[in-house]
Structure formats: structure tokens, C-alpha cells
């Protein structure tokens, strides 16, 4: 497998956008019910991963057809397409990895691990929020997992971007309009500074048990958030 630059993961939560921006060398992973979004948006995923408990018909049948139309490659646990049976499937040929329903990793985390093994260090997750609350929380924790393992992760929906920073800074262009919320994650965050926003912070402490950094506002200046010691969950919501 060639080393990828970005991994685009399409999950099974709420998707309120009509287009997902892709680059030619992106690794695109459909997670369980996220395969339905791929079909609707006419995206061909490189791999489909999941136990498929959230994938409804007719898409569940399509995945089964994809599995039936493939033979396992020697030494691999997943399945791939052969030239003889490529036309047997009604959908584009992708790799299918069916997971056990009882497992430690969520389907999304399995997709993250797949992307990291492929060499990706930048992850963009769509339809990763909404739906079941526990999966939204798990996906927010996944952002911290990525950061602590040398990668960057972003959750996107129609009106927001969510990411995590650790002992570093993040900036937003001066044309940004909307709301910026900042939360301590995984423990207290020390030395938090926010500039270029309506409410300024300088070398502050954000406690993991109190939402002090919610609903700041962009004011037409370049905005920067930094933390000296700890991790911050950053949520930018635009208008």
C-alpha cells in the first residue's frame, strides 16, 4: 500500500453537506453506515470498514455483493477485487473489511488505525457527530488519540470544524465569522492564551471540569489559541 497524505473517513452520523472535498491521493474510508453517504454523494471509497450494524438496505446487500465478488489475497485478512469478478458487483470495486460486533475498538477507531498503518497523519472525519451521543463522544476522544500518536484530526459538518491541539497553537484567518469554543481535554490545560477574539485570555488555566472557554467570538482579526501545557478541544462554528 502506498503511503497516503490524508485520510478521509466518512462515518454514519449526521451529514448535512452535499459535497466532501477530496484530493487525488486521499485515502477514502467508509465506516459502516457511512457507505450509504458515499453512494449518495457518488464517492468511491478505497475501503469499507465496519460490522455493518448501522447499514440499511439496499446498501447492506451491496456490501455483501462486494464481499461475494472478491477472493482473499494471500496473507491478507481483508478481501480485494479480481479482474474476473469486477463486473459481478453492481457498485464500484472497493476493499471490504468486516469487523466483529464484539470488539474493543469502535468502527471509526478501526478506520483510524487502518489509515495510520497506511501512513496517513492527517485525518478528516465527516458524519462523525449527531446520531448516538456515545459515538459523538468517542469520536471527540479519537481526536485526542490522533494528536497523542503524532497525527492531526478534524471533525467536519456543514457549519463547524472540531480539532484538538496539545502544547501548541492554532490560528484562524481574519475573515472568519462565527463562534469559537475551547475546552480542556484529558486534564487541565495550563498557559492558555486567546488573541484576536472578543474575549481575550492570557496564560490562563482551563479546568477539565468547568466549561470556561465556550462561545467566544471572531471579530475580523486573525485569531490564535495556544496552550503551553495540556490539550484543548477546539470547536469553530461559522455563520
Where are these regions (language model features)?
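N-terminal beta-strand-loop-alpha-helix module at the start
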Residues: 1-62
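Short phosphate-binding loop-to-helix
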Residues: 96-118
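Intrinsically disordered, low-complexity terminal tails and inter-domain linkers enriched
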Residues: 60-94
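Long, charged alpha-helical interface segments
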Residues: 160, 165-239
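Short, acidic/small-residue loops that bind anionic groups at enzyme active sites
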Residues: 145-161
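Short Gly/Thr/Asp-enriched flexible loops that form oxyanion-binding sites at enzyme active sites
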Residues: 134-144
Amino acid at each position: 500500500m502506498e503511503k497516503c497524505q490524508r485520510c478521509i473517513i466518512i462515518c454514519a452520523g449526521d451529514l448535512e453537506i452535499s459535497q466532501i472535498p477530496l484530493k487525488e491521493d486521499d485515502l477514502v474510508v467508509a465506516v459502516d453506515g457511512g457507505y450509504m453517504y458515499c453512494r449518495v454523494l457518488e464517492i468511491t471509497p478505497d475501503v469499507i470498514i465496519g460490522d455493518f450494524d448501522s447499514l440499511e438496505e439496499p446498501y447492506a446487500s451491496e456490501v455483501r455483493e462486494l464481499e461475494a465478488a472478491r477472493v482473499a489475497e494471500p496473507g491478507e485478512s481483508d478481501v480485494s477485487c479480481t479482474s474476473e469478478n469486477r463486473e459481478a458487483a453492481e457498485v464500484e470495486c472497493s476493499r471490504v473489511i468486516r469487523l466483529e460486533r464484539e470488539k474493543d475498538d469502535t468502527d471509526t477507531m478501526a478506520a483510524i488505525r487502518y489509515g495510520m498503518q497506511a501512513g496517513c497523519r492527517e485525518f478528516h472525519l465527516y458524519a462523525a457527530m449527531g446520531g448516538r451521543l456515545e459515538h459523538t463522544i468517542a469520536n471527540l476522544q479519537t481526536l485526542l488519540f490522533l494528536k497523542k500518536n503524532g497525527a492531526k484530526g478534524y471533525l467536519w459538518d456543514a457549519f463547524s470544524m472540531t480539532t484538538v491541539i496539545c502544547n501548541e497553537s492554532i490560528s484562524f484567518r481574519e475573515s472568519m465569522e462565527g463562534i469559537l469554543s475551547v475546552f480542556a481535554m484529558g486534564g487541565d490545560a495550563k498557559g492558555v492564551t486567546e488573541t484576536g477574539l472578543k474575549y481575550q485570555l492570557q496564560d490562563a488555566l482551563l479546568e477539565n471540569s468547568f466549561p470556561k472557554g465556550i462561545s467566544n467570538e471572531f471579530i475580523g482579526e486573525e485569531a490564535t489559541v495556544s496552550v503551553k501545557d495540556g490539550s484543548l478541544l477546539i470547536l469553530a462554528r461559522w455563520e
